[in-house]
Amino acid sequence: MIVTAILSGVILGFFVNQIRAIVIASAKQDLLEQAQIGLDYTAQDVRVSANADDSNRWPDANAPNPTDQYSWQSNASSLILATGAQDQNHNVLFDDPSKYITAKDNHIYFISNGTLYRRILASTITGNAAVTTCPEAVATSTCPADKTILQNVASFSVQYIDGSGNQVVPSSARSILLNVTLSKHEYNQDITATYAEQMVFRNDS
């Protein structure tokens, strides 16, 4: 009787541990899929952009430094993309058509309170379909909320790579290497997943 009870307890404990391991593995896989989707989105934005800007080219009333509307910086944790402006029909807009120099919006990827956001700073060129975005707390109909890319972000890093594979200043980069770690505390433990992705710029004017 005692032996049977002990064996039953051992078997039950084994199955409980197995189920717990499966659930944790599933949660980790979910985090990994979220990380991949988020970086795929960001990498696609890199692919259609001309380059990284060292700082924002358009003023932002919600910039990191409230007294400096040009205080965004491309660095190890923030990325400023120079992305071609388009009209409502997805036609490219040009600052200088004779030299094929396209107008550029800024797409800014940054972390705030464990969330990766994308902010748009729209070019002032006539006909631009893009709209400047704002933090959700101050968003309006004319300045919609920044797009949420990823939540539960434990770390997010950006590396700026030239054609020879060397790390360079943002504006000299030929490609961008993104790395993100997501983390959630579930089942009395921290569950994490890390994903990295590299993408080359389109590199037009």
Which residues make up each language-model segment?
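Short linear sequence signals and composition-biased patches located at protein termini or domain-edge surfaces
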Residues: A130-T133, V138-S205
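Aliphatic-rich helix starts adjacent to a transmembrane/signal segment
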Residues: M1-N51
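A generic fold-level signal
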Residues: Q34, Q73-S74, A173, T194
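Type IV pilin-like appendage domain
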Residues: D68-S164
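Aromatic-acidic/polar surface patches that form glycan- and anion
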Residues: L31, A35, Y109, S171, ...
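Short amphipathic secondary-structure patches
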Residues: N51-Q69, Q73-N75
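Phosphate/oxyanion-binding loops and surfaces in catalytic or ligand/nucleic-acid-binding neighborhoods
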Residues: N17, D45, S49, R119, ...
